[in-house]
Every structure is written in structure tokens, then in C-alpha cells.
């Protein structure tokens, strides 16, 4: 960098040479990301620099000014040369990227183009629907409307002019050419709908059988009674986190209070935070518990690649991991009870084929708003029915990524954590299953966590959960076909686990209720039966709500919201199926930091008071302590009532207008059930499109 005096002179001369024109600073960035040249050309900075230059001229004399002018001209030439070199380098880099694009860049660009393509398709569909509605309204007011079952072509004497003739020609065209492909597609979607409904019914019957026979994994005797001689195995506890300042404290606190001999377990806080202030806060929390005698270490990666999988993979590469037999994983918002290890670890005893013990999630904010209530319905069914049934009858299910205990040997023999997808939990579960390891699910062991309270956070979470599996399917398919497991297990993995529950469900849900149904309103010759629109979906929603009976009043909002979410899930499924850019994205779900107990804030405040200043000074540096104080002051000065803004979702709004348009058309045909379904579904899309469901984003 140039000396301060030289920089002042350059700015002053540069401003004079340009006639005092105001502008914005010009930043020339070279190929090295750590080197940049900033040329000041802004109104405020220029005035300050001119004042400084005048002051220097008054104190330096004429001779010194001449020598300084020569140096200034030299620096001006150097700056211009560097700027030209930077532009040349940028041009060369852009040209190189154009001819040497990485697959990820190409996929990302394709993903953005696909998103625009889908939105364009919805807009085009909406425009055609509005045009068709205008035609139908004109026909209705002129008395040309023909009822669906009795469609016929009028005789020549009945035609009342060229407009009526054109309308009759349109009716004949749609009956002869448009009706057949719509009927074929609708029948295919109805078939998929029936298959998926049967799968859900079988799962519910399996859950009923488990409840009736009281089937569940059990521990023989009480291994922790006095005099039992139980040898506590070595357990590693991992807490991966990334910029989650709202929840880090309570998750670390809960892990440190696990009821297990302290010499027999170690806690790894795997911090991938990019915010240095959050890193300091987490370090201080780790230091506090370490001072209290807990075996806890703080790990931070310099190269944060691979998202959560890369974080876990890096932690498992430590030399001391070989001394541990099991690893328990908790995300940053999870709060295990003190007896968690005592309820899970004994299941491994005498069961060498057992690779995973998965606990159930419980939600501290399930009653916070309508969005969290609807999520609770979905996840209660997932754990109570899907995970429990698959665990009892198949000894296999998708690992939920947290609140589970792995046998480290199972992880290592299955290839460990891989960074190839954003669903590393499902990836390792499939590979472990192919290697012959068994899983059990403990429905009565619950770990507290949070649900996303804003639609934006929930939408991003669902996108990752539905794009990752389809991407993983292509990666695992060769291994599934060549694995040394039974044919029915291969069929279960391919047909049920991946295709039916990860691909078919979002496909038919979006296509049937958001495309075909409104389309049949304008092509009444291809009508959908009422049982597909109303009766079967209501029955399936009733089955979904059975595991959470208190949510029964929300059965209708749940049905409508699930159809609304089909847009996001279909979008994610397509991106994962074709390996587009958005299937590689990992966005940490926003947390609110809600506690599980009403007095948790009091307990945290009490612990904070115990963390005295001298104790902190022994464990973190003085500069870090100053940063912590400044961070606390900024939090205290922050406004309490931050203004929140609603985000507009264009796809949902466009689909809302489309469905409301189709509802208007169904009203002309006196289709009662079709009209009410389209009306309520359109209003549901409208609420979501205007971000009126859940907590608004800051």
C-alpha cells in the first residue's frame, strides 16, 4: 500500500484532473483474493483528503511540495498500471471460466434456468387460463354454455354467428385432441396416488399392530443397578454447528449434563461458524464447562468444505477417536435429557450387528404458530409410523442426522461420512444397510429440538430434504444393484424408500392438484372424479393426524398446506433428479433459541454469573475478551422491536391466481366440490405466497 501522505496527494490530484467530478470508489481486485487496490473517488472521502492535503502543504513548504508532486505522479501511474493489469487479469479469468467451466457452475446455472422455466410455465398456464375463462364467460352470458355430460355439437341452424361458430370449433378441438392426453396423464397420476395411499395405509396398519402387541426394543434387566458390574463403554458426543448463536449454549449445556462417567465420554463441539464473534462465544462456553471438569473440546475448521458431512468427517479423523466405541450426534438445537446415553447405549450390548440407535424428536415450539403445528403433524407421523414400522419389521430406516448413536465400527466399515450430497445422514444409512448393519428406533426416547418458525426457513429445509435423496439415488443405485443383500431388500430400497416416498409423492401431488385439476376445469370433457379430489385425501389426512390427535382441528389446513408445499417439493425433486445446482446447496435452518423449560433463562443467567471475569481471562485471550464485551454491548443496544418484512413468493402467488381462475370456471359448470376445493386451495397458496403463515423473517 502507498504511504498515507502519498495516498492523500494522489486523491487530491486525481480529483483536480477530473474537474472535481463526484463518484463512487473504484475497487480493482487482482487475481489474488488477498490483494486489492482501492482508489478513492467519493465525495466524503475526497473532501477529507483535500483538507489533509492542504494542511500538509501549509506545514511543508514549497520545496517539499515539489518533491511530493513527483512522487504523487509516480504513484498515479502505478495505480493506473495496476488497474489496467487488474482489468486484463479479470478479462482473462472470465474468458478462461467461459471455456473451462466446472460441473458445479454449469449445474448451478442450469438450476437457476430451471427455476425461471418453471415460473414461466406457471405464468403461461395462468395467462391461458385467464383467456379461456374470458371465452367461457362470454359463452355463458350468450347462452352457449353446454353442460359436461351432455356435450353435443349444435346443428347449423342453431349457430348464431361467427363467434358462436368459433366457440363450437374450439369445443370440438378440445374434445378430439386435448381431452385424451389429459385423461391419460390424470389416470397415471391417480394410479400413483392410489399406490401411495395404499403404502400409507399399510404403514398405519403396521403401527397399529405394534401398539396392539406392544412391540418395542427392550433392554434386558437394569444394567445400571448397583452391583451389576456394567462396564461403561467409551462414548464420543459430537455437536456440529454453524453460526447458530441462538441455540449453542443450551445444546452444549445439555450435552455436558449427560449422566455418564466423565472419564468415559468426550464432547466435540464442531464449530463451522464463519462469524468470529460467534466463534468466541462458543469458545467461552466450552471453556466454562471444561473448567468444571467436563471432557470437552472445541474444533474449528479453517477450510470449511463439505458442509455438515465435511465437519463430521474432519472430527472423526482425530487420533483419539480410535479409543471410542460409539458416537452420539446432536445438532445445535437439540437438548438430550441426562439419561439419553443410559437409554440408548445398552441396546448395543450383546447385539454386534446393531449399527444405529435412533431416538425420536420432540418439539419445544410445536404450538408457536400455525406453521409449527402443521410441521408437528408431519413429523409425528414420520417418527410414530414410518420410522417405528420400518425399524421393527425391516431393521432399516433413514438416519435423521441427529439424536442418534452410531457404532463407530459401522461408520468406518460403511465408508464414513461422504461429502457427495447434502443428505449425508441418509447416505450413511443406505451404505450401512447395504453392509448388513441393523438399526433400531426408540419411540419412547425423545430429544427436544426446534421447528422452523418462518416459512422461508421451512421452505429451504424442505428443499434440501427432497432434493438430496434423488441426487443420492443416482449415486447409490449401482451399489444397491450389486450389494450382497436379498432381492426384497433391494426392491424395498429402490421402489419404496427412494421412488415411491421420495419421487412419486411430490410428483403426483403437484401434477394432480396444481396442474391437472385446474386444467380439467377448462377441458370439462376430462373431469377428475370426486373421490380423488375430496374423499381419499381427507382419509389420508386423517391417518396422518392419528399420531397427534390434538391436531385434529387442523386437518383441513393440513391438507391444503401439504398441497401448497408440493410446489417446493416438486421443484426440489427435479433439481435432485437431474443433479442441478440447487441440489448442492446447504443452508443452515434458522433457529429461534426457544428453551424447553420456562426457567431456562434464569438458569443460564445464573451460570453466566458464575463465569467470573478472572476465570475467563485464564482461558481466552485479552483481545477475545474485549470482542466478547463488544458483542454483548451490541446485543444490548440492538432495538427490541426489529421490523419484520414479508417475503413474496412468485410461484405460489401465480398458482393462487391460477387456482382461483379455475374455481371461477368450475362455478359456471355448477361443480360444487371442485369449486370449493379450488377456492380454498387457491386461498391457501395466496396466504403462503404473501408469507402470511408462520413467523416473518427479520
Swiss-Prot record:
GO terms for biological process: cell wall organization. Its main location: Golgi. Its EC number is 2.4.1.-. Substrate binds at residues 331, 333. The keyword Transferase applies. Keywords: Cell wall biogenesis/degradation, Glycosyltransferase, Golgi apparatus, Membrane, Transferase, Transmembrane, Transmembrane helix. It is an enzyme of class 2 (transferase). InterPro entries: Glyco_trans_2-like (IPR001173), Nucleotide-diphossugar_trans (IPR029044). GO terms for cellular component: Golgi membrane. Belongs to the glycosyltransferase 2 family. Plant cellulose synthase-like C subfamily. Probable beta-1,4-glucan synthase rather involved in the synthesis of the xyloglucan backbone than cellulose. Seems to work simultaneously with xyloglucan 6-xylosyltransferase. Xyloglucan is a noncellulosic polysaccharides of plant cell wall and consists of a glucan backbone substituted by xylose, galactose and fucose. This is Probable xyloglucan glycosyltransferase 2. It comes from Oryza sativa subsp. indica. The lineage of its organism: Eukaryota, Viridiplantae, Streptophyta, Embryophyta, Tracheophyta.
Amino acid at each position: 500500500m502507498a504511504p498515507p501522505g502519498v495516498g492523500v496527494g494522489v486523491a487530491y490530484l486525481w480529483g483536480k484532473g477530473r474537474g472535481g467530478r463526484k463518484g463512487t470508489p473504484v475497487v480493482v481486485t487482482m487475481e489474488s483474493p488477498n490483494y486489492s487496490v482501492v482508489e478513492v473517488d467519493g465525495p466524503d472521502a475526497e473532501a477529507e483528503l483535500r483538507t489533509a492535503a492542504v494542511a500538509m502543504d501549509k506545514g511543508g513548504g514549497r520545496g517539499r511540495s515539489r518533491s511530493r508532486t513527483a512522487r504523487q505522479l509516480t504513484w498515479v501511474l502505478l495505480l493506473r498500471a495496476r488497474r489496467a493489469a487488474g482489468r486484463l487479469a479479470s478479462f482473462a479469468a472470465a474468458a478462461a471460466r467461459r471455456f473451462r467451466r466446472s460441473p458445479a457452475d454449469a449445474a448451478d446455472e442450469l438450476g437457476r434456468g430451471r427455476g425461471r422455466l418453471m415460473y414461466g410455465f406457471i405464468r403461461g398456464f395462468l395467462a391461458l387460463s385467464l383467456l379461456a375463462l374470458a371465452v367461457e364467460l362470454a359463452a355463458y352470458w350468450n347462452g352457449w354454455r353446454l353442460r359436461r355430460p351432455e356435450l353435443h355439437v349444435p346443428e347449423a341452424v342453431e349457430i348464431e354467428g361467427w363467434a358462436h361458430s368459433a366457440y363450437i370449433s374450439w369445443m370440438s378441438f378440445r374434445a378430439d385432441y386435448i381431452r385424451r392426453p389429459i385423461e391419460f396423464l390424470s389416470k397415471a397420476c391417480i394410479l400413483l396416488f392410489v399406490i401411495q395411499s395404499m403404502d400409507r395405509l399399510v404403514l398405519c396398519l403396521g403401527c397399529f399392530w405394534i401398539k396392539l402387541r406392544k412391540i418395542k426394543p427392550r433392554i434386558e434387566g437394569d444394567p445400571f443397578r448397583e452391583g451389576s458390574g456394567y462396564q461403561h463403554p467409551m462414548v464420543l458426543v459430537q455437536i456440529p454447528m454453524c453460526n447458530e448463536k441462538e441455540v449453542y449454549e443450551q445444546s452444549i449445556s445439555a450435552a455436558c449434563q449427560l449422566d455418564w462417567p466423565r472419564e468415559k465420554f468426550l464432547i466435540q463441539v464442531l464449530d463451522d461458524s464463519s462469524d468470529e464473534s460467534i466463534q468466541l462465544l462458543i469458545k467461552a462456553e466450552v471453556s466454562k464447562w471444561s473448567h468444571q471438569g467436563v471432557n470437552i473440546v472445541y474444533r474449528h475448521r479453517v477450510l470449511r468444505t463439505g458442509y455438515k458431512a465435511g465437519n463430521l468427517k474432519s472430527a472423526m479423523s482425530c487420533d483419539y477417536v480410535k479409543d471410542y466405541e460409539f458416537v452420539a450426534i446432536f445438532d445445535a438445537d437439540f437438548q438430550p435429557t441426562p439419561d439419553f446415553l443410559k437409554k440408548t447405549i445398552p441396546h448395543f450390548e450383546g447385539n454386534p450387528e446393531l449399527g444405529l440407535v435412533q431416538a425420536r424428536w420432540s418439539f419445544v415450539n410445536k404450538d408457536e404458530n400455525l406453521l409449527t403445528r402443521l410441521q408437528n403433524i408431519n413429523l409425528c407421523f414420520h417418527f410414530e409410523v414410518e420410522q417405528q414400522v420400518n425399524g421393527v419389521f425391516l431393521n432399516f430406516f433413514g438416519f435423521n442426522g441427529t439424536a442418534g448413536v452410531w457404532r463407530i465400527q459401522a461408520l468406518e466399515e460403511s465408508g464414513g461420512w461422504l461429502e457427495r450430497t447434502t443428505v449425508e445422514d441418509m447416505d450413511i444409512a443406505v451404505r450401512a444397510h447395504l453392509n448388513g448393519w441393523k438399526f433400531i428406533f426408540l419411540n419412547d426416547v425423545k430429544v427436544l429440538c426446534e421447528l422452523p418458525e418462518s416459512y422461508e426457513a421451512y421452505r429451504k429445509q424442505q428443499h434440501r430434504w427432497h432434493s438430496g435423496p434423488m441426487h443420492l439415488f443416482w449415486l447409490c443405485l449401482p451399489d444397491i444393484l450389486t450389494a450382497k443383500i436379498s432381492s426384497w431388500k433391494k426392491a424395498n430400497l429402490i421402489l419404496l424408500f427412494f421412488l415411491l416416498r421420495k419421487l412419486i409423492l411430490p410428483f403426483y401431488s403437484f401434477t394432480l392438484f396444481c396442474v391437472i385439476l385446474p386444467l380439467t376445469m377448462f377441458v370439462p370433457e376430462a373431469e377428475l372424479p370426486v373421490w380423488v379430489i375430496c374423499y381419499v385425501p381427507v382419509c389420508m389426512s386423517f391417518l396422518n393426524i392419528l399420531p397427534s390427535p390434538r391436531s385434529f382441528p387442523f386437518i383441513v389446513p393440513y391438507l391444503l398446506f401439504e398441497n401448497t408445499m408440493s410446489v417446493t417439493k416438486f421443484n426440489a425433486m427435479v433439481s435432485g433428479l437431474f443433479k442441478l445446482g440447487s441440489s448442492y446447496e446447504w443452508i443452515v435452518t434458522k433457529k429461534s433459541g426457544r428453551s424447553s423449560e420456562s426457567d431456562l433463562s434464569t438458569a443460564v443467567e445464573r451460570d453466566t454469573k458464575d463465569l467470573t471475569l478472572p476465570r475467563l481471562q485464564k482461558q481466552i485471550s485479552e483481545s477475545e475478551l474485549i470482542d466478547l464485551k463488544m458483542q454483548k454491548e451490541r446485543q444490548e443496544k440492538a432495538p427490541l422491536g426489529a421490523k419484520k418484512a414479508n417475503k413474496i413468493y412468485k410461484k405460489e402467488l401465480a398458482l393462487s391466481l391460477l387456482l382461483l381462475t379455475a374455481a371461477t370456471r368450475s362455478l359456471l359448470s355448477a361443480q360444487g366440490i371442485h369449486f370449493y376445493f379450488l377456492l380454498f386451495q387457491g386461498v391457501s397458496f395466496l396466504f403462503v405466497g404473501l408469507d402470511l403463515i408462520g413467523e416473518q423473517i427479520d
